[in-house]
UniProtKB/Swiss-Prot annotation:
DNA-binding region of this protein: 272-303
Record-linked HAMAP family: HTH_type_WhiA
Native source species: Streptococcus pneumoniae serotype 2 (strain D39 / NCTC 7466)
Protein name: Probable cell division protein WhiA
Family of the protein in this entry: Belongs to the WhiA family.
GO MF term list: DNA binding
Length: 303
């Protein structure tokens, strides 16, 4: 099950019926038709639970007994598609939900009453996500929430609702419609709180924390590996120089303070500067050992 499906099923599992949620779903996934008896309304979804939810909402709010039809897609995904269909009280339903104008091209945004009411806004966002929302799986590490709209002004209305909850929503216009999106993990988690998907929010945060912990460990390991590589490289350079000095002039001819450092470096090529400093008969600071090693390298360069 994808993360998006898990979020939607959590919302639908709460069995809350909302007038504003229904308004968003119909506006974003509904289509109007004409029959001999008048207007018809069809709402299409690939989610069986959402289809059942719509059926219950029509019955609860308008005493409409709709039909749930289904067919199999013929494309590669071959998903089952559900259509919730009714030809009862369609004009009344559209007028009541302030949707009639949007279907006839006069009003494509979001009703001001929804934009100005927090609880109505929450319910509308919930419906919008159920209809056309998606969240990229947090395991991917690339956080993205999208809600697709047919009309640009509707996408901007969704963004306004999200911004009222202090979420950094942006809108991208496409050839066919527009997308309202969030990209920050914290905004996506807050959105899940807004629509009441608390379990999904906790799951998202858990995955995020695990990913960040793994990344921190990887960075630490990479840094440690790089430090070891630098230490070994510097050590080998010094060891080669000490061997050169030994062959040409003999280590015994080095100044006394350099002889012990040279011997220790040959005996312990894997030692860090601090380990060398601690191993001297008279312990030195790291800078003191570095100073002596630089002297040894300089002597070798001059030979």
């Amino acid at each position: 099950m994808s993360f998006t499906v898990a979020v939607k099923e959590e919302i639908l599992g709460q069995h809350h019926l909302s007038w504003h949620e229904l308004s968003a779903i119909i506006k974003m996934s509904g289509s109007i038709g004409l029959s001999t008896s008048g207007l018809t309304l069809s709402v299409v979804t690939e989610n069986a639970k959402l289809a059942r939810h719509l059926y219950e909402s029509f019955l609860h709010f308008y005493e409409i007994k709709s039909e749930i039809r289904h067919h199999q897609r013929s494309n590669l995904r071959k998903n089952r598609v559900y259509t919730v269909f009714t030809d009862e009280k369609v004009q009344d339903l559209l007028s009541d939900l302030h949707l009639a104008d949007s279907f006839f091209g006069l009003e494509t945004g979001i009703d001001e009453a929804i934009l100005s009411d927090e609880e109505a806004g929450r319910a509308y966002l919930c419906g919008a996500f159920l209809a056309n929302g998606s969240i990229r799986d947090p395991e991917s590490g690339k956080y993205q929430l999208e809600i697709s709209s047919v009309y640009l002004d509707h996408a901007q209305g969704i963004a306004s609702l999200l911004q009222q909850f202090l979420l950094d929503a942006k809108v991208l216009e496409r050839k066919k419609g527009a997308v309202t999106y969030l990209q920050r993990a914290e905004d996506i988690m807050d959105f899940l709180i807004v629509i009441g998907a608390m379990q999904a929010r906790d799951d998202f945060e858990r995955v995020k924390i695990l990913r960040e912990t793994r990344n921190d460990l990887n960075r630490a390991n990479n840094a440690e590996t790089a430090n070891i590589a630098r230490t070994v490289s510097a050590s080998m350079k010094t060891i080669n120089n000490i061997s050169k000095i030994k062959d040409i002039m003999g280590l015994e001819n080095l100044p006394v303070d350099l002889q012990e450092v040279a011997q220790l470096r040959i005996q312990h090529p894997d030692y860090s500067i601090q380990q060398l400093a601690d191993s001297l008969s008279t312990p030195l600071t790291k800078s003191g050992v570095n100073h002596r090693l630089r002297k040894i390298n300089k002597i070798a360069d001059e030979l």
